[in-house]
Structures are given as C-alpha cells and as structure tokens.
Amino acid sequence: MFREAYFDDNRREYAAYQQPAVARNQCTYDRHVARCYGWVRTTLGDGLVTDLIADLNGNPAQTLEEYLSEHGLDTLIQNAVCNLARFLRTSLILTKNLMPHNLVLAPNDLGYRLVLIDGLGLSTFLPLAKYSQYFAQRHIEKRLQWLYFRLEWEVSDRSISWRDTEATFRFSGMRLEVESKR
C-alpha cells in the first residue's frame, strides 16, 4: 500500500525545488521558475507557498494557454519561449512536460518572460537526468521539443484531440552543439 504522501503532488513539487540545478541557481532561477518559500498549514492540510506571478495591475498573470487562445503564437511569445528554452538549457533545471497552463506571462521591458508555476521535477521511471549532465540535457531538449509541438497544437484548429495528437510526438534527438549556442 502506498503512503498518502506518495500521491501528494505538492510534496513531489517541493522535492523538485531541492534539485541541484535549482540550488545552484539561487540568484537567477526565479526569472523563469516561481520561487518556493516552503510549507504553511491550512484548514485543508499543508500547502506549498510559491510566488504569485502578477500582471502590471497586480492580478494573477495570464497563463500561456489563455494568451495563445486570444493572440496566437505571436512574436512576443516566440521570443519568450526562446528565452525560457535558453534558460532551461543553461541551468539544467529539470521539468515535467511544459504545459501551457503551467506557464504564466510575467511582463518585462521586452514584452513577457515565461514563468513555470507548476511541473518541476521528473516523472520518468529511471531518473537518469538527476545524475548525468548528458541525460539532463537530453531530458530538457525532449521537454522543449514537446512544448513546441504542444504550442503548434494550441494554435491549430484542434480538429484532432490533444490525446491523439500527443500520441504522434517523436523526440528528434539532441541538437547539435552549434545550434544550441544560438
């Protein structure tokens, strides 16, 4: 029988905040990852406290999913996605699939920066990416390719369900070193 904590997504998320890449990047990781402050007891049980990413009016920031449905994959968002990809490739912070509803748009002087508010860590059976730089790079590249694939679906006519579309995703392998420095 599994302990209840095994199924507690907050506990897994908290453990993901302890990954070495997050600890190494304490001064910079919060540019694209909501900062975690620890636990607070609530009437519903323990809750994980993270940053509230806000828009210019102080309201919760819009999700990437919401933005895409209103504006499509415009230049502002393409740039924000490129900046997030560059950050993940450099920092080697491990994430689960980068879901558009788990990325919010924080306004900045260039337009937006994407901030991951949920989905840190690994959901793989063998967590090799935790122990090997090569596998961490491979894991991140696969997650980024999956995100690009998902973004194309988000702005499509959605005539095919995401479940059916996702089944066709194929990881195309690691990028060449020259490409990754662009």
For every predicted segment, state its role:
Residues 6, 25-77:
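Conserved structural core of kinase catalytic domains
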Residues 2, 68-76, 80, 89-96, ...:
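C-lobe/activation-segment region of protein kinase-like
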Residues 32-39, 94-107:
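A short glycine-rich, hydrophobically flanked beta-strand micro-motif that places a catalytic Asp/Glu
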Residues 54, 100, 121-122:
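Short, glycine/acidic-enriched loop or turn micro-motifs at the edges of active sites
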Residues 85-87:
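Terminal, low-complexity interaction segments
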Residues 16-19, 79-83:
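Long, highly charged amphipathic alpha-helices
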Residues 1-22:
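ATP-binding glycine-rich loop module of kinase domains
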Residues 20-29, 108-109:
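Alpha-helix termini
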